[in-house]
């Protein structure tokens, strides 16, 4: 999966993630308690399809099926193109 451009946008360090959490709230993380799996860019509170794709890939790599499923559900609601091409949304609903 291509997520290179997300690498530049993602809040990577813990202080960046805390600022993003205080500014945007729980919606920008798939695991807000630990500030894991950010899905919004640093300077925006809008959910990014690239962030959802990166979170989905990382959750699959680390064997976290609940997080991967949550990323897919949010991506389907956001109408991300990568979910429609592979037919993920039909399998979820």
What are these regions (language model features)?
Residues 1-93:
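Extended terminal accessory/targeting regions
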């Amino acid at each position: 999966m291509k997520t290179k451009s997300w690498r530049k946008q993602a809040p990577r360090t813990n202080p960046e993630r805390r600022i993003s959490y205080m500014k945007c709230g729980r919606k920008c993380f798939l695991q807000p308690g630990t500030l894991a799996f950010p899905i919004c860019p640093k300077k925006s509170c809008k959910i990014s399809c690239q962030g959802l794709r990166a979170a989905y890939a990382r959750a699959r790599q680390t064997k976290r099926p609940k997080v991967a499923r949550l990323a897919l559900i949010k991506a389907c609601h956001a109408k991300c193109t990568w979910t429609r091409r592979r037919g993920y949304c039909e399998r979820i609903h």
